[in-house]
Amino acid sequence: TDMNPLLLKPSSDHTAQVVLNGRPIGNRDAYEYFRKEGREELRKEVNAAFDRLAARYNPIVMEGAGSISEINLRDTDLVNMPMACYAGADVLLVADIDRGGVFASVYGSVMLQTPEDRKRIKGIIVNKFRGDIRLFEPGIKMMEELCGIPVLGVVPYYKDIHIEEEDSVVLDYKRMQAIEGKVNVAVVLLRHLSNFTDFNMLER
């Protein structure tokens, strides 16, 4: 459980089951979860999980969750810049160009950091690029000049690498057509579906 010590499993639009070190500790709504009261206890457990891993492995690669620039949640953030600060880790900022607005997203994410946290960001990776990379090459230079941080790479959009999605939001965009002559399997999209990645093998 040290690889994912704190897990949220949505149970409604506003509440989620909180799983700490592999054991459910109750359901909390979003407001209750992000309140400072009790937050430090969760932080201690998350940090302790990192310490156990750091004692056994080097290097350790950590993945944040969501955006690093939700400044209204900065004081209670457990997984992004505060975790990098605790671990003394350098940060790579990964930007999704497929959704559009990548320049505003990257620049805003960098500039909304505190000066100390901004120094931790050592590189930018542009993810899910489609099209002719030559058209984006001037944009790479612009991004580096705007942010003062090197763009380390541009990752093409791959459709066949089968990496698990971060959360269930992606399910809203999954639409498959029935194929004649093959066994077709349909999965009902329930509003608060949990463990949805169990069905990934059926897509292949």
Q: Can you name each region flagged by the protein language model?
A:
Residues 1-204:
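Flexible phosphate-sensing "switch/lid" loops adjacent to ATP/NTP-binding sites
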